[in-house]
Regions:
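Short helix-initiation/N-cap motifs at beta->coil->alpha
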Residues: 83-95, 141, 159, 177-187, ...
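Periplasmic-binding protein-like
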Residues: 47, 126-137, 201-246, 268-282
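Beta->alpha turn/N-cap motifs
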Residues: 45-49, 86-91, 100-112, 136, ...
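Flexible hinge/capping segments at coil-to-helix
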Residues: 123, 135-154
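A ligand-binding cleft/hinge motif common to bilobed small-molecule-binding domains
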Residues: 92, 108-118, 166-169, 188-224
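Ligand-binding cleft/hinge of the Venus flytrap
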Residues: 57-58, 70-81, 147-149, 161-178, ...
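Extended ligand-binding regions for polar small-molecule ligands
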Residues: 67-75, 137, 152-153, 161, ...
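Extracytoplasmic small-molecule ligand-binding "clamshell" domains
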Residues: 27-106, 117
Length: 282
């Protein structure tokens, strides 16, 4: 005698079928699919912070963040120009992701645990820190010379509640002069009112690229922070794709593009990734 399938078995079957259908729907709803269907990538970024994102003489956005956007577009469409940049304030970097105004934010976003509760961070593409800018003819050669100078050393810094504390992490006895703008800070170095300026290492390197032979920087930096792009949480396919693109830009087939951008904006020749055993597994 044949028995009818039990109600329990039927419910299990329906649940499994529903779960499978939901899985297919979720995969189809990935940002990766919608970006590919649209035919262009929409990147949130800034426009006033060289060498990361700023307007060139032709009015077009340029900088390292902009180049990162082009690299992701190339990964998507094999065409780095298929990208639209939405200029946004720093405060809008996360809200614009959450409201789907942009597909990704690449705007020198510092990775923090609290921000990671709101967005998903990609692989980091730069490690920032505080560096020192000195005139090329400075009597101070390295950080030890500057430490030995004690309070006879004057360091210019952009005005900030933590400015003095930050400088004293590296130069405990230095005199710290604070300025209202970056231009005034650099003028203090140029005029000799300050022996050095302490600012983002990326800014130090960029200024040296823009003014060959005028400045130099000791081989020392401190207060590290990580920069990454950010995407909306909950879309692993999209995050995986962006991470794959960035990974191959920094270690694989697209390394020449990443290295050329790094050289252009920071004046640094990156060593080629080691061939053989993947370095990320060491």
């Amino acid at each position: 005698m044949h028995r009818r399938p039990s109600l329990f078995k039927a419910c299990v079957f329906l649940f499994a079928a529903s779960a499978a259908a939901m899985g297919v729907a979720q995969a189809a709803d990935s940002k990766l699919d919608s970006v590919l269907a649209r035919g262009k990538l929409i990147v949130g970024t800034g426009s006033t912070n060289a060498p990361w994102h700023f307007q060139g003489a032709d009015g077009k956005l340029q900088g390292f963040d902009i180049d990162i956007g082009h690299m992701i577009a190339k990964g998507l469409f094999n065409d780095p120009t298929k990208v639209e940049y939405v200029v946004q304030s720093s405060d809008a970097r996360i809200p614009n992701l959450l409201t789907d105004k942009v597909d990704i934010s690449c705007q020198f976003i510092t990775v923090t645990a609290s921000r990671a509760q709101q967005v998903a961070f990609t692989l980091p593409y730069y490690r920032e820190g505080v560096g020192l800018l000195l005139p090329a003819n400075s009597k101070y050669k390295e950080i030890d010379d500057m430490k030995a100078a004690g309070d006879s050393l004057t360091v210019a810094v952009l005005q900030n509640v933590y400015a003095e504390e930050l400088v004293h992490q590296a130069l405990p006895k230095a005199k710290v002069d604070q300025y209202d703008s970056v231009d005034l800070m650099y003028q203090a170095v140029n005029s000799g009112r300050a022996d050095a300026a302490a600012t983002d290492q990326s800014s130090v390197k960029y200024l040296m690229v823009q003014n060959p032979g005028r400045y130099r920087s000791p081989a020392y930096a401190w207060s590290p922070q990580t920069y990454a792009c950010a995407v909306k949480r909950g879309d692993q396919d999209w995050l995986n794709f962006v991470n794959t693109t960035l990974h191959e830009a920094m270690t694989g087939v697209e390394f020449p593009t990443y290295a050329a951008s790094f050289k252009q904006w920071f004046g640094v020749d990156l060593p080629s990734p080691a061939i053989g055993f993947p370095v990320e597994f060491k």
